[in-house]
Amino acid sequence: MTRRIAATVILALALAPLAPAGGPVYSRFALGDILHFGSNRAYAMGITGVAFTEDGFVNIYNPASLSRLSLTRFTGGFEYVNSSIEDAGGSQRFATGSFQSLALAIPASSDDGIVIFGAVTPYSLVDYDVVVQETVAGSASTQTFSGTGGVSTLSLGTTYRPVTDLSLGLTFSYHYGAIQHRSKVDFADAAFADNELRTSQFLSGTSFTFGMTYGGLSSLLGTSSLQPLTLGLVLTTPATLSIKEERFLLTQRTADTSLVRRGTGSLPFRWGLGAAYTGAALIVSGDLVVEQWSSADFFDPPAVEVNNSLRAGLGIEFPARRDPTSYWERVAYRTGFAYHASYISINGQPVNGWSVSGGIAFPIGPDARMNLGLQVGSRGTTDNGLSKESFFKLSLSIDASEAWFLTIEED
């Protein structure tokens, strides 16, 4: 009888919102933390890069931004995150590192702006570990909640430039991944059997992204002051996810229950707008991205309220000089600010955040750079029994072209 009670308790705990615990609990809900990564350059400027269109950079958030590449380019990156979680019970610090991106873009026709590209990036991330001391069914207990995994995206796409000032892009994305949650209860009273519930979800689905950039406002309006201005648009279709869930309930002595379920969920429609003013000595860019999570479907009803999300950012870059006389004049400097209204609310309280960013691009060879990006900010609040996360993020990437491998012979 006590084992049945304990099993019922842990199943209820696994589906309920967490009490204050001092852990990074927000990635526990729905599909986890949603990531918006276009490039390390955009990362350091606090934006996604919806309106970027320059040669020499791979920014995958808007496929149209690749249409001006003149050489085959590749990029790969890694992110380190150090965060402090604070709630009414105190604070804890966590650190983790993860893969950030890998992309390759190959120009097929520079005259027509045709570029073929592929990329692998994380779409969402689940990474939490929380311990709660609580009395359950009259017995003191230690409850452990943890989760890992997320959704990744494999993208293949192409671009086309029908006229000089208009670039178009189309991306096919295959979303895949696995998310594991673990809920464990250890009882102080030997009359209760310790229990552990392991849940694994395996997800897959597809979507399309259409992108466009336009730099012809100067000609359209007859003013040369707008010549450096580019506008960007990106639209991503909803994705239907096929989901297989495996649940495994263990007690102190035996594996009690194994359950496999199949169903569907979805990723939401996403749209973004951006603008970039590209001068010789200063680049200013801003963008806005909205995801309609309120219309998305979930395999199980989330234990939190789901809202449409919004991400807005504004950044500047001091690019490398075109006629450098020293190494440091070949270095680019970046900074920016971002605000994020997330797609979840808990107890009526939105989980929103902000960040200040910066970065440096160091030349490391012919047409190759090592990019460092930094973000410092916070999300959430300690109001209404919730947690506040203060974070420090560091991104490192290598961006290079085929010119990196050329051997230059000296006379």
Residue ranges and their predicted role:
Residues 22-44, 105-411:
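Outer-membrane beta-barrel porins/channels
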Residues 16, 73, 185-187:
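Short alpha-helix boundary/capping motifs
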Residues 1-7:
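Bacterial N-terminal signal peptides that target proteins for export
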Residues 18-122:
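N-terminal, post-signal peptide beta-strand-biased segments of exported outer-membrane/organellar beta-barrel
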Residues 8-17:
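Bacterial N-terminal signal peptides
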